[in-house]
């Protein structure tokens, strides 16, 4: 039996990670970006970079996404790593399954920016969505790892 396409993708991610020498936080961030860029994304997914009260973010939507349904997603990465880009493929699946648009926030990261900056960025993004006319009743806030902590 031949390896699956999914296994081939995981093996490629390991190969990319293993080939890199990492010395700094920036090196680790770049490595994570490269690893996650190996994951394939469906061709019908749309992404749009936006500024959210000065914080970069990315809208991710599928053809099924309804304009008034929104997920504010806060990525994981120990407050050191991660971005809309590293989570894009997973969030594309989330947008399709939920029929919602996903706003992935690139909150400020440590160690350059101390805590509570990620909390401030997250609250600011929530308020920005309300100002854009998104009803709190049609919004979900979620995240993984550090982003899950921010969502709470």
Features from the language model and the residues they span:
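Short beta-strand element of the alpha/beta-hydrolase
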Residues: 68-78
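Short amphipathic alpha-helix adjacent to the substrate-entry channel of hydrolases
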Residues: 85-105
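A generic structural signal for alpha->beta connector loops
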Residues: 44, 54, 99, 136-138
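Short strand-loop-helix active-site module centered on a catalytic nucleophile
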Residues: 57, 72, 94, 115-152
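Conserved catalytic-core motifs of eukaryotic protein kinase domains, centered on the activation segment
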Residues: 83-85, 114-115
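Short beta-to-alpha linker loops that shape the active-site pocket of alpha/beta-hydrolase fold enzymes
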Residues: 106-110
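A glycine/proline-hinged amphipathic helix-loop "lid/cap" segment
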Residues: 1-65
